[in-house]
Amino acid sequence: MNKAKTGVLLVNLGTPESPTPKAISRYLWQFLTDPRVVDLPRYKWFPLLKGIILPLRAKRVAKNYASIWTEQGSPLLTITREQQHALQTYFKQQEKNIVVEVAMTYGEPSIKSAMQRLSTQQVDNLIVFPLYPQYSSSTTGAVFDAFAQVLKTQRGVLPFDFIHSYHTNEDYIAALVTTIQEHFQPDEFLLFSFHGIPVRYENMGDYYREHCKQTVLAVIDRLGLTENQWGLSFQSRFGKEEWLQPYTDQFLAQAPSQNIQKMAVICPGFAADCLETLEEIEEENKEIFLANGGISYRYIPALNARPEHIQMMANLILNKLNQTSK
């Protein structure tokens, strides 16, 4: 057993506490007031958000959340806790002195509360693990900001490491290939859909699109697909600003007219299934594709708590720990 105890912060985006307009409004306020997510001038954005956007959006989003909510609660939080428990079990079996806690950038359990739990367990160092394979300032960058905000309140800052990205990690690519092979049929078109970001963020230096491309090319190389068998698109845009294109919903609407009748969609940027995959991709976008002449449509689930995914996560943590100890 290692003498030093390592604390791991497993961080995902976040989720409302319940599928109600009030809870969702509270969650969206925290999310959409983060300048990493929306960087409009505060004096313009806050009144618009509070007075118009949240009252309208919270009611609509509440219906969407209600459609995916389970007895255990939010799928995102439930799956992330499954990942936590699987990792903790693995580290115990391997006799590694590692404690894993779940944290969310927005909502609960917060990064602050997770760090407090690790503090009570007297960890000696930290590894912050944002569950975003492809770096973006609006996701991974936001995790770093939230983590740094907690550090500002501490006099005794523990040594820490930060997993920046893992978009071409061999274990990650292999896990994607395995799950695709389990679901994908040779006569289908394979669409890789990633959460979008404003083009303006890319112009300011965010290299998210390039990370997405590198992930897809690595997977395609392993699968041996030709150019006419796959595509790359970006989903979940909001507002009037231009986002990364092609847009997933528009791609799916136009695909049948391009002789693409059978569609399989995977979202490699999501480490756990959530609203954007279970409702937007699996339900809304399926309707778009079929309504425009598509014959069949399948959503390939996120890696979630698959054994290959857990092993990949464990390897990333152990590799980071080994690098630090050298």
From Swiss-Prot:
Taxonomy, superkingdom: Bacteria
The record's principal subcellular location, in a coarse class, is cytoplasm
Pathway listed: Porphyrin-containing compound metabolism; protoheme biosynthesis; protoheme from protoporphyrin-IX: step 1/1
Give the Pfam families listed for this entry. Answer: Ferrochelatase
* BP GO annotations: heme biosynthetic process
> What Gene3D superfamilies has UniProt attached to this entry?
3.40.50.1400
Paired cysteines (S-S): none
Key words, A-Z: Cytoplasm, Heme biosynthesis, Iron, Lyase, Metal-binding, Porphyrin biosynthesis
User: What PROSITE patterns does this protein map onto?
Assistant: FERROCHELATASE
Catalytic activity as recorded in UniProt: heme b + 2 H(+) = protoporphyrin IX + Fe(2+)
- Indicate which residues the UniProt annotation says bind Fe cation: 195, 276
Localized where?
A: Cytoplasm
Q: Name one GO cellular component term.
A: cytoplasm
Q: Name one GO molecular function term.
A: metal ion binding
Q: Which InterPro entries match?
A: Ferrochelatase, Ferrochelatase_AS, Ferrochelatase_C, Ferrochelatase_N
Enzyme nomenclature, EC number: 4.98.1.1
Protein family according to the UniProt entry: Belongs to the ferrochelatase family.
NCBIfam families assigned to the protein according to its UniProt record, in alphabetical order: hemH
Function in brief: Catalyzes the ferrous insertion into protoporphyrin IX.
Name under which the protein is recorded: Ferrochelatase
Q: What is the lineage of its organism?
A: Bacteria, Pseudomonadati, Pseudomonadota, Gammaproteobacteria, Pasteurellales
